[in-house]
Curated annotation (Swiss-Prot):
One of its GO terms (biological process) is glycolytic process. Homodimer. The gene is enoA. This is Enolase. Coiled coil: none annotated. It comes from Aspergillus fumigatus (strain ATCC MYA-4609 / CBS 101355 / FGSC A1100 / Af293) (Neosartorya fumigata).
């Protein structure tokens, strides 16, 4: 079925920054997608096109990307007359039209908006939900797998004030019997955590960060983990709810001396206290021995390959590559060859089309990696990643705390999918890393 209209506009994300929204119109109606954007972005990501005009939106406008959709991509794609159900052909055409390796010509934000809106049009034409269409495109087996929600309940690093270096502390309800129960457990722990943070650190500690987590004035990882452990205990889920961390260590890596500065937010940071990667690896291991940590994301800097391989050999929990792999097939291949990690963080806007995102997941599965589908810190009401997580059988999704509508939108969408699928879906639970094989 041909596309009759493609129209892009500038809308706002959850941080008040402009982002791209794309409408694709076919005989089945209007199909809309909004593109997210990140705060801590890896240097190997696909290029997000921003206007750079400091007099508007501080240079963060997306009018160029919008114009590229309306004047270049839209007319060309309509003229090409590709079937909207043929996602790989559409995405291949978009990449060819751009002509660069990192989508810097038309902008990954322009291309992704079109790619995702076309996927929704394709699902509508088949008369199936988006997750079912994605499952067909990826060739995943049945039953569907509902992901474990990794809920970012406490923020540090670049996402918060305070001296805490690590960026995210997540709760992982992997013992729950279903997705809806997992979400209930997470929400209950989150409420306890918020109350505890206010009690211990003052009223403002209940304020939430970009992703809905609390950001009390915490100095160390132990302090953060103790607070979360106490909240889990108060909610009655000790032993049932695990913990995951996203360290985002590229943010505090001193490349010139190859050391990590856990006090990076302090301008007077003492270089004698900076850690080598071996010392940082030992810190992670001591934390994992003391707390129920099942997953660590970006434990080392994005180009400190030696550190990743060293850590991988000596640890037994999930090691997730985000800045390391940036959902890029070439980087994933290198990480597999160097045995750097065992799970991929899948962010569709890092690679820029749905087809390449599916391929990144398949490449990861082929080497027995886990795949965690992820939001960005600048999010919107778009829920596509919920359908992607279910369609790919990824078994794990990271989309913030059970707080702030742009985070809940995804979790609520999975609740709807769970209800719709009934017996035809299983909850990944503790098998989240190997969910694709369930």
């Amino acid at each position: 079925m041909p596309i009759s209209k493609i129209h892009a506009r500038s809308v706002y994300d959850s941080r008040g920054n402009p982002t791209v929204e794309v409408d694709v119109v076919t005989e089945t109606g209007l199909h809309r997608a909004i593109v997210p954007s990140g705060a801590s972005t890896g240097q190997h990501e696909a290029h997000e096109l921003r206007d750079g005009d400091k007099t508007q939106w501080g240079g963060k406008g997306v009018l160029k990307a919008v114009k590229n959709v309306n004047e270049t991509i839209g007319p060309a794609l309509i003229k090409e007359n590709i079937d909207v159900k043929d996602q790989s052909k559409v995405d291949e055409f978009l990449n060819k039209l751009d002509g660069t390796a990192n989508k810097s010509n038309l902008g990954a934000n322009a291309i992704l908006g079109v790619s995702l809106a076309v996927a929704k049009a394709g699902a509508a034409e088949k008369g199936v939900p988006l997750y079912a269409h994605i499952s067909d495109l990826a060739g995943t087996k049945k039953p569907y797998v509902l992901p474990v929600p990794f809920q970012n309940v406490l923020n540090g690093g670049s996402h918060a004030g305070g001296r805490l270096a690590f960026q995210e502390f997540m709760i992982v309800p992997d013992s729950a019997p279903s997705f809806s129960e997992a979400l209930r457990q997470g929400a209950e722990v989150y409420q306890k955590l918020k109350a505890l943070a206010k009690k211990k650190y003052g009223q403002s500690a209940g304020n939430v960060g970009d992703e809905g987590g609390v950001a009390p004035d915490i100095q160390t990882a132990e302090e953060a983990l103790d607070l979360i452990t106490e909240a889990i205990e108060q909610a009655g889920y000790t032993g049932k709810i695990k913990i995951a961390m996203d360290v985002a260590s590229s943010e505090f890596y001193k490349a010139d001396v190859k050391k990590y500065d856990l006090d990076f937010k302090n301008p007077e940071s003492d270089p004698s206290k900076w850690l080598t990667y071996e010392q940082l690896a030992d810190l992670y291991k001591s934390l994992a021995a003391k707390y129920p940590i099942v997953s660590i994301e970006d434990p080392f800097a994005e180009d400190d390959w030696e550190a990743w391989s060293y850590f991988y050999k000596t640890s037994d929990f999930q090691i997730v590559g985000d800045d390391l792999t940036v959902t890029n097939p070439g980087r994933i291949k290198k990480a597999i060859e160097l045995k750097s990690c065992n799970a991929l963080l899948l962010k569709v806007n890092q690679i820029g089309t749905l087809t390449e995102s599916i391929q990144a997941a398949k490449d990861s599965y082929a080497d027995n990696w886990g795949v965690m589908v992820s939001h960005r810190s600048g999010e919107t009401e778009d829920v596509t990643i919920a359908d992607i997580a279910v369609g790919l059988r990824s078994g794990q999704i990271k989309t913030g705390a059970p707080c702030r509508s742009e985070r809940l939108a995804k979790l609520n969408q999975i609740l709807r999918i769970e209800e719709e699928l009934g017996e035809n879906a299983v909850y990944a639970g503790s098998k989240f890393r190997t969910a694709v094989n369930l």
